[in-house]
Amino acid sequence: MSHNFTESYDIIVIGAGHAGVEASLAASRMGCKVLLATINIEMLAFMPCNPSIGGSAKGIVVREVDALGGEMAKNIDKSYIQMKMLNTGKGPAVRALRAQADKELYSKEMRKTVENQENLTLRQTMINEILVEDGKVIGVKTATHQEYAAKAVIVTTGTALRGEIIIGDLKYSSGPNHSLAAIPLADNLRDLGFEIGRFKTGTPPRVKASSINYDVTEIQPGDEKANHFSYTSRDEDYVKDQVPCWLTYTNAESHEIIQNNLHRAPMFSGIVKGVGPRYCPSIEDKIVRFADKERHQLFLEPEGRDTEEVYVQGLSTSLPEDVQKDLVHSIKGLENAEMMRTGYAIEYDMIMPHQLRATLETKKISGLFTAGQTNGTSGYEEAAGQGIIAGINAALKIQGKQELILKRSDGYIGVMIDDLVTKGTVEPYRLLTSRAEYRLILRHDNADMRLTEMGREIGLVDDERWARFEIKKNQFDNEMKRLESIKLKPVKETNAKVEALGFKPLTDAVTAKEFMRRPEVSYQDVVQFIGPAAEELDEKIIELIETEIKYEGYISKALDQVEKMKRMEEKRIPANIDWDDIDSIATEARQKFKKINPETIGQASRISGVNPADISILMVYLEGKSRSISKNQAK
């Protein structure tokens, strides 16, 4: 078929949400000519649900995006109204930052970045069709019948694919926040032969701030201590006049209202068909599933400095509007609250992620990538993490360079993508610290140490950023060496100091590092014995040093496991393997292998339903094939 291409790009990104902006920025910064197409420019990097960035596991993803050279961390550092470090009373593996965002400012700042980015064109247009020839992407077609050529296309449409909003018995075609739904593109993806799923998510009502009685709620302030998502942000720019959130609860009256109206709840009446998120259920779902709970937490979260809208986190619902009003008014502090927006559920199409490679390129069509909620995930942070990887790999493919695959030991982004492409998902996927087996080495405080070098190699970390990173890394390395080299001896003078600090005296000579392994001994305590470092150390470097030393034994075990898995990941499986040619593997394993087509032995071993015996048989088969090929080549 001949095409009348009016414009030509290296990469076209469809959708300008959190995945789309990261994908387009990464690819354009790598030198590709990129078109970022969106149904509505006003909704670029918009937050249709919660007005926040970060949280458990998610905050670490934001730092990983930043370390690779992405934008989300920098953008939230320019637009937050509250910053808080979570889980400070727990171990370092689960600590993470969370920021309350000024949602309008967040979108505005990101738009400014996108509009000023070299090689990147932003355009409001609806893409109806992805053009494919001989199994390869060649471009797209718009609703206005314009055809644009492209070497790669990245689909980041979020919840817009055949989106439908549901409130009570009302159901209508819509994308997020009542924007247009992408119906022709959804049809096109089906026609291209992709297996499509149907998921659901939801959002709570918004209430007017001046109508809330805050006196009967519990204040939730931000942190006074400076913290940032981006490693480029400075402590002196930390916002001091932060806006608090407030805590309240549902009660017996709230639960009775919901119980009495379950017959009108789309979740239970059969109107909602899509699968909802397990870890962010609607309030009506919570009341049914956790009937023994007397109350549920609700956080009142301001949506910005210049708006009266307050997001009622924990009250996601698609109940009819009249029921929502009664429900809101049953809650302490909201007795007279004005509802500014009604909560709703949204159903949407998504691509079942087992059809993707770990680069986020589809297996079916060369040059077609997908990222974000299109792949079955939930959350802005998960979307951004996939977006930057899709953008990087689309650019690398076009440039004929080696693809980037983040391993599970590299970061939470690697964990998420591996989970999606290896295990698939039957519900909106959310990142949790429990999903990461190497979480002690995937911490919020070492994301830059893990990924900045990758970002530099790809071309997303500039000279200034790299110079700052090298200074930090050198300071860290030098101080660790110093702590390993200086010995504390059990002499009278030293032990007098040790006991004065309230610690048990030394019985043997130990290095400063060994002394610091004691749970009660801090870096600052050790400095009293060995003096300060040659250069003054930033507080965050000290935190990193303490964590690495105090958890060294656990970290060492984790790194040993990583090495074992690395060897399995290096054993590649040929793309043209005939799974029916392998004798003795279990039927379930054969079926899963055919469906997922794992690329490495490591990936094959993580597929549910595949046991160690199947992996052993597969390895014997591959070794036999390899020997056979070697013999034939030797003849």
Swiss-Prot record:
InterPro entries: FAD/NAD-bd_sf (IPR036188), GIDA_C_N (IPR049312), MnmG (IPR004416), MnmG-rel (IPR002218), MnmG-rel_CS (IPR020595), MnmG_C (IPR026904), MnmG_C_subdom (IPR047001), MnmG_C_subdom_sf (IPR044920). Its cofactor is FAD. Its main location: cytoplasm. The keyword Nucleotide-binding does not apply. Keywords: Cytoplasm, FAD, Flavoprotein, NAD, tRNA processing. FAD binds at residues 15-20. It comes from the Bacteria. SUPFAM superfamilies: FAD/NAD(P)-binding domain (SSF51905). One of its GO terms (cellular component) is cytosol. PROSITE patterns: GIDA_1, GIDA_2. It is found in: Cytoplasm. NAD(+) binds at residues 276-290. One of its GO terms (biological process) is tRNA wobble uridine modification. One of its GO terms (molecular function) is flavin adenine dinucleotide binding. Gene3D superfamilies: FAD/NAD(P)-binding domain (3.50.50.60), GidA associated domain, C-terminal subdomain (1.10.150.570), tRNA uridine 5-carboxymethylaminomethyl modification enzyme MnmG/GidA (1.10.10.1800). Belongs to the MnmG family. NAD-binding protein involved in the addition of a carboxymethylaminomethyl (cmnm) group at the wobble position (U34) of certain tRNAs, forming tRNA-cmnm(5)s(2)U34. HAMAP family: MnmG_GidA (MF_00129). Homodimer. Heterotetramer of two MnmE and two MnmG subunits. This is tRNA uridine 5-carboxymethylaminomethyl modification enzyme MnmG.
